[in-house]
Each structure stands twice: as C-alpha cells, then as structure tokens.
C-alpha cells in the first residue's frame, strides 16, 4: 500500500515559466485593468508633477531660489501682478537666483559683473525679452538677430543718432511738447484744479514724441492718438510667462496684444512707403525714416555708378542695402517698444520728483533760462541741450534713481557656464538685472537719495561699469545719447513754461511694475501756466 501510494504520479510545475518578474507583471496588469479613468489621470498627474519637480531641483543646483516649486505653474499668479518688493528680495537672495513658471526655467543675475557677462556673451545667449515677444514684435525683428545680420542692421541704424541727424528731429519734438503742455493745463482746468493722475498723458506725449521723431508728418494725429491709446495692450501681452497658446484665445492679453501690434505694423509700413515716395522727389530729411531712406538711396546710386564702370565715385558715409517697408516697420516698432514704457516711466518720475524737490527745479529753471538768454520761449536746439550740465545731471540721476529698464531677459542658446560652479541650462531664460548695479552703495553712496550733484561734484561719472541704464555689449541701446537730450529738451521747456504741484498720496512712493516702474497712484499732479 505504501509503495502504491508512493508510486502515484504528481502534477509537474513548469517553474521556469513563472519567474517572480512574470508574477509581478501579471499581477500589475490585472490591477491596471481594474483601474478607473480617474486613477489613470491621477497617476499621470503625479508622474508629471514629480518629473517637473525633479527637473527644477536639477536645474536649480546650488543657486538661490525656492527649495521646491509650486506644482507645475510655479509663481505664475505672482508674475501676473508683480510686486517690486519681490524683485528686491529676489536680487538680495544671491548673485544668481531662479524661479520656474510652467515649463520655463528662469535665472536672474543680480551681480553687476555677471550682468555684464550675459550682455557680452552672444555665443551663449540672445535677447528674447519674453517668450512671446517674437510673435508680437516680429520673428525677423533686428533685435533678435545675431552676428552678421544684426551688425548689418546696426551699421545702418547707428548714423540715425549722430548729432547731424538728431538736430533735425528737435523742431518736431518742440511742437509736440508745446501741444501737450497745453493739454496738461487744460486737463487740470477741466478737473477744477484738483489733482488727477497724469501717467496716462505722459504715456501719450512720449508716444507722440517717438512717432513724430520716427515718421514726422507721414503719420496722422489720429494714428498717433490711436497708437498711444492702444499700445499698452502690446506691452500688457509681454508678461514674463503666458499661459501656453493663449495668443490664439480671443480676449486674452496675448491675443489683444498681437492684434494691436499687427495694426501698428501696418501703419508703420504705410508710413515707410510714403517716405520713400517723398524722398524720391529730393526732399530734405526731417525724421528718422527720412534719414534711413536717404542713406538707402545714396547707397543705391553709388552701387549703380560703380557697376556702370565709373571711376572715382565718392563713397557715401553709410553704405547700406535696401530695406523693405516691412523691415522698416518691424525695426521702428522695436524702437517704439523699447522707448514707450521706458520714456513714460522716466517722464512720470521726473515730473513727480521735481515737484517734490523745488530746490532742484529752481536750479534747473535758472540754467535753462540762462541758456536761452532770458527768452523762456526760445526753442531748444542741440548746442543748447549739450550746454546744460545741471539739467544733464538731473536726467542722469533720475535714470539711476528710477531706472526705466530694471532687467533685460535673454535666452540661453546653449549651456552657459556663467560661473565656474553653475551652468545655465539650454533654453532657460537668463535675466541680467540693471537695478542692483544702479543702487550699489559702493558706487553711489546713499543710493536711495535723489542727488543730482553726485554727477557734478561726486564721482558718479566714473562708475561706468555700474551704469547699466542702456545695457552693454553688442545689443546695447542705440539711443543712449538721444534719450537724455530728448528728456532735457522736454523738462527744460516745461520748467520755463509751466508750474505743477504734486499731491502725494499714501501710494505715491509705492512702485508699480508694468514693464517698468511707475508710481502706484499714477502721479497726482495739477498743471498751470
């Protein structure tokens, strides 16, 4: 019996077919098959959040910044309504710091020398302003070009800001100032002499000054008013980070900004065509586009004569290629973008601070009256504007104290070893900051005090590495001489022809960040003759 029992055959298991790995896979598959759609969604979301968090920590490495990122969106809500104090805290956190908003990793360089390194490293970084900027300004806009293509544009544009050229822009600027100063007084009278915000009118006068300088009388007053009213929509669209694809959603800031930009581009192209037709008749240049088109015509005639075999042909001072109406439009649109908010900010603070500092305004007034030999209605010209040391000091101190450009976003086109210990990842934004260098107490003692004399009796003029108002490197501002002279013309004329009183509020010194810096209360003033 025992032997029979022992001889009964038993089923044989194929052990090789059931490894632990296969048991696990089979069990997992059965588990997944039982999952609901919500379980799949939650698992995918957790995986995405984990990946996003790990990538942030890896990109951050050793630089300052939050230890962890708010899942996916990062500080997006704060970016929609930026606080200036938050920027100060970020800059103070370290020479390099970072944030990550949605998919975009952003590195801020607050150290002066690191800012210079970014500005002067075109092989590693290119200007991007914000990710959506190319859609608004134009993908082929010259500010985004590098190397030979950028140099070609710059060579053609630089002569537009020589003394000879700038002298021809001033009569139109004088007329714009006279027109808008009357509007300032009328606006105060219409408000029964009560204070009102003037930031809006300051934006309008600066838009008019820019457009008349760019296009002279080729652009109508209605178009000037329309662009001045609408251009803030283009600025509002250029937030540091936008919701993906929002440019295609009607009613969003990027959608409205794109439509505004397209309309301005079309108007500028029309003005360029009108200019070419007018200059072909032999007219004298009176605005930027006139000078640019004249240089094209001179270059074309030169090339034609050389090609015809003429010898001893005099070469023009600025030999350039023919630029299309669209190229002219895109270029002058970038000029307007660069100038509109920056000049509006500078003008707003200048009028507010001078009203608060009657001692400064009195000295500025005396200097401008003396330069006009006692005739306060004498039009300004270039030699006059270049002979106003105190007015120049006031302008420079204003640009340092309340810089109209606080940083300039760049895009890392390849891994950028910005320090020996940190490399900015490719496709990250790297933002050199200008404000910290301009408020460095080692370069400018008591940097929060508005003190024009630091440019006369102090050594502020020697702090050239800290003077980042107009950037540095191959993409620095072409108008670094034009801007202070234009501001001097406007404020000198205002000082002699107007009185204005600032009515401070609890928010007058609170800084609003809208592309640049503005007083939070809009600058409450009353103007009179």
Swiss-Prot record:
Enzyme class, UniProt record, top EC level: oxidoreductase
Keyword DNA damage among record annotations: no
Its membrane topology: Single-pass membrane protein
UniProt keyword list: Heme, Iron, Membrane, Metal-binding, Monooxygenase, Oxidoreductase, Transmembrane, Transmembrane helix
GO aspect biological process, one term: terpenoid biosynthetic process
EC number: 1.-.-.-
GO molecular function: heme binding; iron ion binding; monooxygenase activity; oxidoreductase activity, acting on paired donors, with incorporation or reduction of molecular oxygen
Localization: Membrane
Superkingdom, taxonomy of origin: Eukaryota
Transmembrane segments: 38-58
Pathway(s) annotated for this protein in UniProt: Secondary metabolite biosynthesis; terpenoid biosynthesis
One GO CC term on file: membrane
Binding annotation for heme: 477
Reported cofactor(s): heme
A Pfam family of this chain: p450
Family to which the UniProt record says this protein belongs: Belongs to the cytochrome P450 family.
Function noted in UniProt: Cytochrome P450 monooxygenase; part of the gene cluster that mediates the biosynthesis of the sesterterpenes ophiobolins, fungal phytotoxins with potential anti-cancer activities. The first step of the pathway is performed by the sesterterpene synthase oblA that possesses both prenyl transferase and terpene cyclase activity, converting isopentenyl diphosphate and dimethylallyl diphosphate into geranylfarnesyl diphosphate (GFPP) and further converting GFPP into ophiobolin F, respectively. Other sesterterpenoids (C(25) terpenoids) are found as minor products of oblA.
Listed name of the protein: Cytochrome P450 monooxygenase oblE
Organism, scientific name: Emericella variicolor
Gene behind the chain: oblE
